[in-house]
Amino acid sequence: MGKIIGIDLGTTNSCVAVMDGDKARVIENAEGARTTPSIIAYTDNETLVGQPAKRQAITNPKNTLFAIKRLIGRRFESEEVQRDIKIMPFEITRADNGDAWVNVKGDKLAPPQISAEVLKKMKKTAEDFLGEAVTEAVITVPAYFNDAQRQATIDAGRIAGLDVKRIINEPTAAALAFGLGSTKENQVIAVYDLGGGTFDISIIEIDNFDGEQTFEVLATGGNTHLGGEDFDNRVIDYIIDEFKKEQGVDLRNDPMALQRVKEAAEKAKIELSSAQSTEVNLPYITADATGPKHLAINVTRAKLEALVEDLVASSIESLKTVLKDAGKSVNEINDIILVGGQTRMPLVQQKVAEFFGKEARKDVNPDEAVAIGAAVQGGVLKGDVKDVLLLDVTPLSLGIETMGGVMTVLIEKNTTIPTKKSQVFSTAEDNQSAVTIHVLQGERKQASANKSLGQFNLEGINPAPRGMPQIEVTFDIDANGVINVSAKDKNTGKEQQIRIQASSGLSDEEIEQMVRDAEANAEADKKFEELVQARNQADGIAHATRKQIEEAGDALNADDKAKIEAAIADLEKAAKGDDKAEIDAKTEALIKASEPLMQAAQAKAQQAGGEQPQAKKDDGVVDAEFEEVKDNK
């Protein structure tokens, strides 16, 4: 069996590494570089990848594709894709399934299909170095990638001829690269990963015990649409706006000129990491009736920092949230690891240092650490790397919709994966023969405010009073973060399950919106949850009281029966409203009105010659509402 290679499939650059003895080694590509631009160009005769594709981008802008990772697993209508459409020189189009694809020379190409070209280049680079075929890989993704994006990455690997043995989060991979072989007994590190198109922050605990190293992710967060490309776009906009002021020409309408500006902006941004100012000089950038136009603009580091300070600030806000989720203070962080090329920017380093009160480590290569960590994980899976245990987490809570439109969480966010969690639910109606399991992801109490991942029916439930059937719902998340959900009737043994498909994954805007909404609406969520609990309690008491009236029969006099039924009607009317105090008051009124019913029941029981046995409580059964959804076939 061959080696399992580690691939950092980046937005701007990609990198491949492999275990060489007891250490991971980054492999140089055919051009002699340790990283490869994640750029793909389609010409009349061939497909170019990496530096050759980048070199011809100016003359072939519409067919030269870059930053495809920003489209992978995304819907065409999403805010991020619509924003990218305005600035990308190539054509982003809507696929039949609603995903964002790319139109090249009249052909619609899926992002996994395009990304596969980069993976093929990484595969070939490794094969040339090893002198043997490579069929297995560990591929990294941003920690905040959702199910759709993870599955799309696995698909890209499959298209490239690779069996993806594991999807690993980029900050976790960087931690592996940093901590492998460390002799420190216990340390907590923060991995700040600002790459070409994505941002992640993870708090990771590294333990050494009895010769075994454990890497445990305590919490993770980020933004899958924030990275160096966004920094570049700020510089591009500035250059274009300045040129328009001077010359009255908008270069956004000229794809070839726009590509030249893009390359110059990226170069200027990089130069300003070591210089205080740089000159952007693009002769013959365009022409009009008066003749050729030349672009010459001086950009200072101070100007660059002013253009992007809000982007850096948003990343610092994520740091605060993730530290809180991890239950750690700034003082408890032993080391800060910076990953991703954009972390070379002095402003980024300064703001991170200010937040943590200490400088980040300088001995970790931000371009190579992720690929090295992926190779280490490949070595772990292969058995070449011993005594290393990696414990990653799921970034968002998972659950199902239950009675009253509440999301009942089975797996909390930042739960270690792989994981499996089961909980028993029941029916909402008497003699209900089917239930629909509605799978949700998010942080809100109100089911409709979360993302629907899918739903499925469990049919053939034996007729029984409501609350009697026991439906066991199980969530199973594998080590790649891919979700399976099953439901089983414990009485009949009948089972149904669903694998959450890529087409129903979350977009990162929805993830971030869920978290923001959860924080902004925490009080509203609490009140809603209390209202639903009051409604559910009212419904249960009304249902039980009606049954007791039937059982009491003639033992209950007509006046008392009328009063109780009126109290039930009042309670049911109140339960349809949004006034919790009113529901509570009507619940108490029904309990008081039902006192004669209890006396009648006791009298009837004594006449029957013994006490009525108490109903057995359904311990561990959650009162849940399932509705049967009929398929229109």
Swiss-Prot record:
User: Which controlled-vocabulary keywords does the entry list?
Assistant: ATP-binding, Chaperone, Nucleotide-binding, Phosphoprotein, Stress response
* GO molecular function term, any single one: ATP-dependent protein folding chaperone
User: Residues annotated as region Disordered?
Assistant: 599-633
Q: Name one Pfam family in it.
A: HSP70
The keyword Phosphoprotein is assigned to this record? yes
Residue stretches spanning the membrane? none
Q: What induces it?
A: By stress conditions e.g. heat shock.
Keyword check for Ribosomal protein, yes or no. Answer: no
**Residue numbers bearing the Phosphothreonine modification:** T198
Biased composition, class Low complexity, residue ranges: 599-613
Task: Please describe what this protein does.
Answer: Acts as a chaperone.
What protein family does this chain belong to? Belongs to the heat shock protein 70 family.
Q: What is this protein called?
A: Chaperone protein DnaK
Q: Tell me the gene name.
A: dnaK
